[in-house]
Amino acid sequence: MLDPRGLARPSRFCPRIIYAGTSHIRRATAAALLAASLCALPACADVGVGAALPLSPDKLYGELFVAVQTAQVYPDQKTFVDTVPKADPAVILQAYRAQKDVPGFSLKAFVDQYFTVPFETVITPPAGQSLRAHINWLWPALTRTTATAPDNSSLIPLPKPYVVPGGRFREVYYWDTYFTMLGLQASGRDDLVDSMLDNFAYQINRFGHIPNGNRTYYLSRSQPPFFALMVELAATKEGEAAYTRYLAPLRKEYAYWMRGAAGTAPGQASGNVVVLPDGTVLNRYWDDEATPRPESYLQDVATAQQAPDRPAAEVWRDLRAAAESGWDFSSRWFGDSATLATIRTTSILPVDLNALMFQLEKTIAKGCAVARDFACTVEFGNHARKRAVAVERYLWHPAGYYADYDWKLGKVRDNLSAAATYPLFVQMAPWGRARQTLRQTQTALLQVGGLSTTTLHTQQQWDAPNGWAPLQWIALQASQHYGQALLAQTIGERFLGSVERLYAAEQKLVEKYIVDGSGTGGGGGEYPLQDGFGWTNGVTLRLLDAYGRGQ
């Protein structure tokens, strides 16, 4: 039965459900999720630009979604949410309810009948390519054009071409794209840089923010705000025109991240904003939903079960907020620095996010100056100065490095991570503290094959011994900004060595590396190691230009 907007009414999603293969999942948890994900079905938040958020697969398919993900019809939970329905969701649900209790019913056969499974493009490069030639060959293979999308698909169409990371990541990702752009620009593909900037501006205008990725199930959160740095990158080629062209979306993105700041009392939080007891305003990662992530449904249900003393919705929100951080998952977000079930992302003020917000404020001030809106220039210059003061007060560890702050516990966290170099990357750190941070980073994180993500081995992918291309670039640039060219070169050459060793052995680039010098791909995480790989390609090209010894 449909309501006037053509959406299935939530009351029809509440009959008895058979949970295939749920012996390891408490029925109470599954029922709670079903109520949370389905009874909110018709609620589409107004994004302020005349468009409602399209529904994600968990809301479109309700009990069928729960059954498919719980039964693990596909090994990867992301597969089902990326499928394309062959009929209207209401028709599919009606068929499911009619057939599910019939003897001999096969859920897998039903899904095969009604959904088209996404396929991963097999990339077979020519033999004997150099590393540089291989990356340049990959750009067209990783480029997608989806100006339209099938009805009720989770894919959000974008007006212009874009580059995907590769593997299971069949869509564009927000913060990945900055590092991909570094390589595209080095390859002379400024056309793609401009296209992706325009796509992000389109999403800001449509949704009010840049989603995690162009999928409906990513719309409830963003990712680290690199849009300002993308504009800065474009400005290196086209000059000041880039600032005026993207000034309006930059200001809209800032408004998104600062929602609720004016009306939040000291000691309270609202969305991505936290107001500390002294009135200082800083940002945190957040997600507007508090249910299991559709693309990782079963894992999130299991994690909440491992924290029986916490409301499941609280755990799920913190898992989602960690996904917004891009560091999913890491000891940075764990209460005990070791266990996923202790995750408390929304209680933490991250040093990287607040450095990026400083950059956003600076870029808006610069754009306003170019546009000769000097009142705006003063306003955002003041925002940036206040944030710099706040970062120095709250996000500095007495041991001599920048760190995250737990605003609920009222103390800086001890975890030293590669995120410590972000204030240096955006050039907001005083020289003395910058030098201290670089010394600590070099001593604790620099390995034979590059910079380790953290000092802790937790089996999570954003911890030791993994190293990630974007964090190498951030630390390298941070070192250069503060006069440490030799350290920058050491980081760059060591990580490039990791990439070269694996490429020599397997003829591919991957999303993360073990930086112990073995030349192997990184481990941990919720899925197998992916190759492609957008941001590794981008950073590697820049490293080849700087330290590639003629390659």
Swiss-Prot record:
EC number in record: 3.2.1.28
Catalytic residues (UniProt): D328 (proton donor/acceptor), E511 (proton donor/acceptor)
Alphabetical keyword list: Glycosidase, Hydrolase, Periplasm, Plasmid, Signal
Catalytic activity: alpha,alpha-trehalose + H2O = alpha-D-glucose + beta-D-glucose
GO cellular component: periplasmic space
Compartment(s) of residence: Periplasm
Primary localization class, coarse: periplasm
Pfam family, one: Trehalase
Keyword Signal: yes
Any one Gene Ontology BP term: cellular hyperosmotic response
Top-level taxon: Bacteria
Disulfides per UniProt: none
PANTHER family in the record: TREHALASE
Function: Provides the cells with the ability to utilize trehalose at high osmolarity by splitting it into glucose molecules that can subsequently be taken up by the phosphotransferase-mediated uptake system.
HAMAP family the record matches: Peripl_trehalase (MF_01060)
Protein name (Swiss-Prot/TrEMBL): Periplasmic trehalase
Organism: Ralstonia nicotianae (strain ATCC BAA-1114 / GMI1000)
